[in-house]
Amino acid sequence: MNPKGRTNLNRSIIGGHDHGSILQLLLFLLLLSSHGGFKFVAGQATHGGSDVSGDSSRFDPTMAILMIVLVSVFFFLGFFSVYIRRCLERVMGMDYGNPNDAGNWLATNRQQARGLDASIIETFPTFQYSTVKTLRIGKEALECSVCLNEFEDDETLRLIPKCCHVFHPGCIDAWLRSHTTCPLCRADLIPVPGESIVSIQIPGLVNDPPGSDPNGDRIRSLGSPDARLIESVALTCNQSMPRRSMSTGWNLAGMFTNSDRTGQHSENLDRFTLRLPQDIHNKLVNPNLSKVHVALPQVMSSTRGYRTGSLGSERNYFYYERFDQDGRLDRRPFSITPPYRTSSINHMSPGGSGGDKVRASSPKSLLLAMRSPFDRLFLGKNNNVGENSSDHLRSCDATPSNTV
């Protein structure tokens, strides 16, 4: 606190005392005058009473003391309210030497709660809905989550690059002027110097290649080099197939659910999210934002689907299992330490076709894929989908192994 501000504070307190003394004096005179008028009226009403006896009988000192006490209480209440307000303003760090800043701590809080600058808001791309209507992925109608109105072909949309949510410019601009997050998913929209935004497209949900099976399995993978773990979560349409997963102690599978990039259920946000092919998305965003957009590699196949994404690791090897559309197992080991090699053990299918192979690095690794009791319970004994039993070990031992 500067000396000037302290001087003004002292002046206000001293001035308060002066005004209080004058107020007390005025109230005391008013009390005396009212008491004299009351005596005059009462003397006229008695008609013949003695003036001395009337004055002594009608003067009530208790009432006068009570009035003075009440006035003093009101004065001290006003004084302490002003004093407490001054102390609060001092805590807020205001400069009371400047009379224009007095009482502006609420305005300071409003400034701290401001949203994005207009220059940042203008960096979010805008376009007409008719230009992307035929290119968007998904058949559900697209709506603005602020006004809940469906977009028309001639309306202008504003895209939030971080979450791909779209709004009317009038709706979202009013929000962003007082907030710094997306109103739908609460994504932080404040740009950080040197930050590069990564726009992640979930494989299978965007950029589906021509000829791919729309009912095929879609998979998202997370690699953990520290724990040498790759855990995959299969988004299968056939929920009757049991899932198996093996991990090194991290329950990473629970981190990924059937949701989109915002962390909320996709069925609730599809009508507010504009999903475009990656190249079109980059064309919309890159002219206004000098940031990097990266897409995850597409893990799909028109002939084979991934039934499960469970993985195990043994002796610096990664194993993954996948099943083609006929339910035949394809198990591939890959070494993560040089030299990188894979080994295979050919096993002829009962039908005699040479195209079905079971690949593994050693007989021990096949034990990791042995059929669990849940597979026996749900799939039955005659179903060969996902079957890796000890019977295969005997047939595999009879076939020589080839090292690539």
UniProtKB/Swiss-Prot annotation:
InterPro entries xref list: RING-H2_zinc_finger, Znf_RING, Znf_RING/FYVE/PHD
Membrane topology: Single-pass membrane protein
SUPFAM superfamilies: RING/U-box
Membrane-spanning residues: 64-84
GO molecular function: transferase activity; zinc ion binding
Biological process terms in GO annotation: protein ubiquitination
Catalytic activity: S-ubiquitinyl-[E2 ubiquitin-conjugating enzyme]-L-cysteine + [acceptor protein]-L-lysine = [E2 ubiquitin-conjugating enzyme]-L-cysteine + N(6)-ubiquitinyl-[acceptor protein]-L-lysine
One GO term describing the cellular component: membrane
The entry's keywords: Membrane, Metal-binding, Signal, Transferase, Transmembrane, Transmembrane helix, Ubl conjugation pathway, Zinc, Zinc-finger
CDD domains: RING-H2_EL5-like
Annotated protein name in UniProt: RING-H2 finger protein ATL11
Encoding gene per record: ATL11
